Amino acid sequence: MAKDIKFSEEARRSMLRGVDTLANAVKVTLGPKGRNVVLEKKFGSPLITNDGVTIAKEIELEDAFENMGAKLVAEVASKTNDVAGDGTTTATVLAQAMIREGLKNVTAGANPMGLRKGIEKAVATAVEELKTISKPIEGKSSIAQVAAISAADEEVGQLIAEAMERVGNDGVITLEESKGFTTELDVVEGMQFDRGYASPYMITDSDKMEAVLDNPYILITDKKISNIQEILPVLEQVVQQGKPLLIIAEDVEGEALATLVVNKLRGTFNVVAVKAPGFGDRRKAMLEDIAILTDGEVITEELGRDLKSATIESLGRAGKVVVTKENTTIVEGVGSTEQIEARIGQIRAQLEETTSEFDREKLQERLAKLAGGVAVIKVGAATETELKERKLRIEDALNSTRAAVEEGIVAGGGTSLMNVYAKVASIAAEGDEATGINIVLRALEEPVRQIAINAGLEGSVVVERLKGEKVGVGFNAATGEWVNMLESGIVDPAKVTRSALQNAASVAAMFLTTEAVVADKPEENKPAMPDMGAMGGMPGMM
């Protein structure tokens, strides 16, 4: 396919138009008085959102060169979302400001490589200063503040803070769509996996259709049990103890299942069989997790063990097990804290090494199940459109809160970027490098300016006053007052601010050093095939 090529100024100007189109659509959502953007969906109702990355991903421009510019800024939002989970609009605003200011200087004759050096130096200094001024997050109220600012909803802030308090910082918090209008929190304590009883005859509570085992023994194996003789020795030992038994196996079938059910119904012993969770290597890892949590052993041929040789010492123990048609929950496993901590450390190490998003999610789930539990926030709303928008906001708030726990918090509302302004301005540099630093200084003002504009105020007036205020004092756009941001609970996670700045600078530097842009030439529309009449008809036809 033939290509269109543009060079230097012409290339950068075309891409800048795309950058501005996308950034202008995204930046109206910034701050407490930011507006929403409506996105058309081919199926179903339109999506109304104020989430920067969601808007950025939807934008496709007709002109190929403009579209490349837009996609570069969408990449800033996307990367910030991947790293910090929030701050995508701030990242977009910063990128637009750096690209716009940088392009002015390149047009005036500045060397793009010198500008790049200055931009990188300024951002490195700003990031170091952000680390210095960040405060560790403490207590439930701080977590609630971070979440409430991100979601623009205090109720959501309280909900997320409660969820994190109940499942711990390593716990998994997931979002589900509620069937009602209200948003609620549901916490599953202990380890839960998505496998239910092998037979409904094993239930102990017919009203709730669940089996509840108190202080049970737990047999853990990756083998299929089809012959009762295999587990008879260990079964007899459990019956002598007068305790219930939970069997976790690849499958329990045929004669073995029938014998267990008959004896359960006769009241000889209380037993529930469930299939092992997961598949392949993940199944082995999850069975090992259950064994460590319950101080049992995985009976597997890989370790030279068979079911006949299993003794009561090989079995795990737990305070309580609840088995429903779909799930099994093990509460109060008796495993030693040291072993559980060691296993958690092992999973954390794997988390750092993995590059697969799917593996990361599964490892995070395993970590949560060992560390504390799983919280589910059930999001409710009056309409489907509102539900989608609310779910996106809560997702952002959740990511924001996790980022705050990791790297601490800084003053919100763009104030922290202005707080590092003086430090960046003091960097010794000259020539194009100094110009690069000035580009970053101008960009640092932009989030505050945009928040003020979205609140219906003159942005430059707010920026100039902020430069003269003490560190930590900022403009509360929601009330129009000047307050101490940290004390007022207007905070941003340091990780979100840092990621937004670094990603914006990275793309801006690449943009300014671009000298040629190559795009596919649009295909000419081929003429439609003429009709038969135009051909004078076919011979022999009337």
Swiss-Prot record:
Gene3D superfamilies: GroEL (3.50.7.10), GroEL-like equatorial domain (1.10.560.10), TCP-1-like chaperonin intermediate domain (3.30.260.10). One of its GO terms (cellular component) is cytoplasm. GO terms for molecular function: ATP binding; ATP-dependent protein folding chaperone; isomerase activity; unfolded protein binding. Keywords: ATP-binding, Chaperone, Cytoplasm, Isomerase, Nucleotide-binding. It catalyses: ATP + H2O + a folded polypeptide = ADP + phosphate + an unfolded polypeptide. Transmembrane segments: none annotated. InterPro entries: Chaperonin_Cpn60_CS, Cpn60/GroEL, Cpn60/GroEL/TCP-1, GroEL-like_apical_dom_sf, GROEL-like_equatorial_sf, TCP-1-like_intermed_sf. Forms a cylinder of 14 subunits composed of two heptameric rings stacked back-to-back. Interacts with the co-chaperonin GroES. Together with its co-chaperonin GroES, plays an essential role in assisting protein folding. The GroEL-GroES system forms a nano-cage that allows encapsulation of the non-native substrate proteins and provides a physical environment optimized to promote and accelerate protein folding. This is Chaperonin GroEL. It comes from Bacillus cytotoxicus (strain DSM 22905 / CIP 110041 / 391-98 / NVH 391-98). The gene is groEL.
